[in-house]
């Protein structure tokens, strides 16, 4: 027994294998996502009617919002899209045996559970951190939050930030130094490009967040005055520092999703991606522009009119590379032999709802309009269409695309399609009415509202219950896959009549990337020797 336990500990807790670490990230993200979903349901239940429903304390309500946001951003989307899919797939995409720094990879993951524990403690101690995920002073200052909850949230962010920085360095080194000579950068799979760009954004933006929250920590505990007006500080400085990180952060969340969607749409349209180079440069442009538009979150703080004009124009320019990506996905589908598998359904759902989220983003980019919409439910609807329906749908698309390769087991196709439709209906019923609430002026982060808003709020809360049903159905699908799933061959997503489980299929078909040349699941060291240029690799590109 002790031998079995020690082997288990060595396999999972001391692992240096990128595939096992990727699986750990996905399991961790699944757990955090369920926890964050539970918090979101509490929010929607409180808002299902006017006046007090379940949560009498407004501080508790705001603490739930903070916990929900931080859980979903730092402990669900980032670990899943970057840590999970990135770790598992990147060595396979570049033809390498593992990540460049395997032990660094291990510590990158194991910093996250302590960080999650700190965040949960933060929510449970002295009423929690009722600051929202933005942690603006003076609300997060020592006068408004005198207990340790904000300090614990800051420590949680520090730990998850260090984890992300170490992971980003590992990804960049792996892609630059461990590619097989046959795969030059302009032939790298789009998901590989997405990971590179995301890693660079992390390296450039996270230190700024670390600086801002460290200054806040010293303001709270060591009597400094970075953000204390009484001591000559400026709380607006915190907003500038936070959003210089915060806006690239939203692209850190969505760019890996772009890579996944490009891969799945290409595979299930039976065509190579339309405009590969354009797609790469569009992602690069989005990443660069993301650093010079941060003050569009701050139109209401009293910016100079010329400053507001600049940030409006710069923000609207981001719509250009985003539009290139949307139309390239549509062009990839056009004329293709489309198969509506669960993965493809989620990809098409992503394109549809990301477009809606992008259109409301164009509205909010205008300083004159954002003065009215700032801190209303219009903003909540906008970023949930991009995240709750963008990043999350991309995660499901990637899951259903690669999980037969990862586990070597097939899943129930029918139930997976049912899950897509339940989730699609649920999230739209939840978030589309919030556009109307925002247009009517309902403010965010307040647990009570006038009776006039009751109708749309009730519909929105009903939609959240539908979404929870989809989440439980997903867990059941995973359970069935693990318990009853049939063996998945090397190419689990091909039509059975069109493939044989041999490398001959690679010679006859254009493949998106190298992982399909391997067994399902891949061996711990997938490519012991680097794959050489051959007919197979020529057929890939």
From Swiss-Prot:
Ca(2+) binds at residue 46. It catalyses: 4 Fe(II)-[cytochrome c] + O2 + 8 H(+)(in) = 4 Fe(III)-[cytochrome c] + 2 H2O + 4 H(+)(out). It comes from the Eukaryota. O2 binds at residue 251. Heme a3 binds at residue 382. GO terms for biological process: electron transport coupled proton transport; mitochondrial electron transport, cytochrome c to oxygen. Its cofactor is heme; Cu cation. Binds 2 heme A groups non-covalently per subunit. This is Cytochrome c oxidase subunit 1.
């Amino acid at each position: 027994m002790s031998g079995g336990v020690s082997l288990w500990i060595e396999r999972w807790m001391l692992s240096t294998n990128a595939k096992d670490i990727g699986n750990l990230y996905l399991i961790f993200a699944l757990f955090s996502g369920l926890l964050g979903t539970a918090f979101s349901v509490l929010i929607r239940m409180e808002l299902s009617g006017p006046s007090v429903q379940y949560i009498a304390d407004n501080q508790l309500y705001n603490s739930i919002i903070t916990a929900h946001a931080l859980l979903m951003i730092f402990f669900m989307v980032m670990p899943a899209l970057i840590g999970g899919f990135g770790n598992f797939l990147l060595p396979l995409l570049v033809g390498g045996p593992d990540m460049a720094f395997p032990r660094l990879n291990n510590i990158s993951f194991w910093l996250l559970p302590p960080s999650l524990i700190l965040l949960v403690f933060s929510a449970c101690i002295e009423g929690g951190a009722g600051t929202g995920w933005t942690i603006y002073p003076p609300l997060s200052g020592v006068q408004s939050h005198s207990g340790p909850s904000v300090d614990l949230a800051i420590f949680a962010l520090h730990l998850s930030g260090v984890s992300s920085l170490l992971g980003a360095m590992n990804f960049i080194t792996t892609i630059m130094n461990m590619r097989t000579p046959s795969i030059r950068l302009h032939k790298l799979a789009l998901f590989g490009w997405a990971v590179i760009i995301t890693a660079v954004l992390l390296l450039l933006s996270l230190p700024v967040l670390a600086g801002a929250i460290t200054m806040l920590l010293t303001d709270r505990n060591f009597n400094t005055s970075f953000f204390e007006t009484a001591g000559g500080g400026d709380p607006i400085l915190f907003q500038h520092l936070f959003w210089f990180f915060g806006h690239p952060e939203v692209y850190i969340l969505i760019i890996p999703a772009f890579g996944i969607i490009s891969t799945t749409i290409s595979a299930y349209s039976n065509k190579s991606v339309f405009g590969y180079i354009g797609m790469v440069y569009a992602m690069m442009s989005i990443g660069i522009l993301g650093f010079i538009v941060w003050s569009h979150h701050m139109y209401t703080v009293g910016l100079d009119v010329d400053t507001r004009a600049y940030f409006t124009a710069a923000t609207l320019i981001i719509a250009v590379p985003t539009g290139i990506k949307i139309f390239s996905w549509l062009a990839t589908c056009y004329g293709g032999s489309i198969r509506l598998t669960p993965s493809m359904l989620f990809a098409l759902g992503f394109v549809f709802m990301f477009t809606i989220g992008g259109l409301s983003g164009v509205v909010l980019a205008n300083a004159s309009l954002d003065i009215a919409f700032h801190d209303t439910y219009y903003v909540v609807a906008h970023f949930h269409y991009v995240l709750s329906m963008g990043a999350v749908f991309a995660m499901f698309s990637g899951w259903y695309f690669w999980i037969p390769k990862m586990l070597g087991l097939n899943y129930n196709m029918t139930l997976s399609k049912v899950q897509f439709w339940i989730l699609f209906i649920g999230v739209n019923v939840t978030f589309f009415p919030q556009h109307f609430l925002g247009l009517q002026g309902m403010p965010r982060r307040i647990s009570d509202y006038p009776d006039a808003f009751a109708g749309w709020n009730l519909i929105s809360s009903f939609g959240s219950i539908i979404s929870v049903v989809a989440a439980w159905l997903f867990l059941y699908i995973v359970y069935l896959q693990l318990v009853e799933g049939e063996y998945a061959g090397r190419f689990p997503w091909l039509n059975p009549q069109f493939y044989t489980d041999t490398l001959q299929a690679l010679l006859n078909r254009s493949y998106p990337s190298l992982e399909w040349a391997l067994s399902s699941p891949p061996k711990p060291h997938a490519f012991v020797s680097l794959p050489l240029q051959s007919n197979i690799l020529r057929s890939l590109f």
